[in-house]
C-alpha cells in the first residue's frame, strides 16, 4: 500500500490562520468588554512576529481581502451580537467596542445601511410579529 503524504498548509496559509485566530481572540475581548482598544495591523503583525506589510500582503494573497476588511466584518458581527444580546444603549455598545458613539453610528450605518437604533427597532418588529 503506497504511503500517502500529509499535506501541510503553506506558510502563507499558516500565517493567515494565525491572524484569524488572533482576530478571534481580540473579538472575544470585545464581547467580554475587556478590550482596551482596537488593534491595528501593526498590533497583529507584532503578535505574529512578522512585518505589517508582509502580513497584509499575505492575507490579501490567501483570502483575497485586506486585513482591514476582515477586521471590520468581524467587528460588525460582534456589534450586531451586542446590539441583539444586550439591553445597553448603542452608545454603551460603542464604548464596549472602544469606539466613539457617533463614529460607531457611522461605521454601523456604512455596513448595515441603517443606524444601530434602527437595527434594534427592526429586529424587535420582526420578533414581535
Task: Annotate each language-model stretch with its function.
Residues 1-53, 60-62, 66, 71, ...:
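Alpha-helical bundle regulatory/interaction domains
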Residues 111:
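Active-site beta-alpha loop architecture of Rossmann-like, nucleotide-cofactor-dependent enzymes
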Amino acid at each position: 500500500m503506497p504511503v500517502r503524504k500529509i499535506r501541510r498548509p503553506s506558510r502563507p496559509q499558516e500565517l493567515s490562520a494565525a491572524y484569524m485566530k488572533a482576530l478571534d481572540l481580540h473579538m472575544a475581548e470585545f464581547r467580554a468588554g475587556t478590550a482596551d482598544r482596537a488593534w491595528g495591523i501593526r498590533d497583529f503583525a507584532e503578535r505574529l512576529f512578522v512585518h505589517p506589510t508582509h502580513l497584509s500582503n499575505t492575507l490579501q494573497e490567501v483570502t483575497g481581502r485586506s486585513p482591514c476588511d476582515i477586521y471590520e466584518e468581524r467587528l460588525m458581527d460582534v456589534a450586531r451580537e451586542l446590539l441583539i444580546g444586550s439591553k445597553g444603549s448603542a452608545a454603551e455598545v460603542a464604548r464596549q467596542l472602544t469606539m466613539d458613539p457617533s463614529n460607531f453610528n457611522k461605521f454601523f450605518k456604512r455596513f448595515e445601511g441603517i443606524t444601530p437604533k434602527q437595527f434594534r427597532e427592526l429586529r424587535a418588529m420582526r420578533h414581535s410579529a
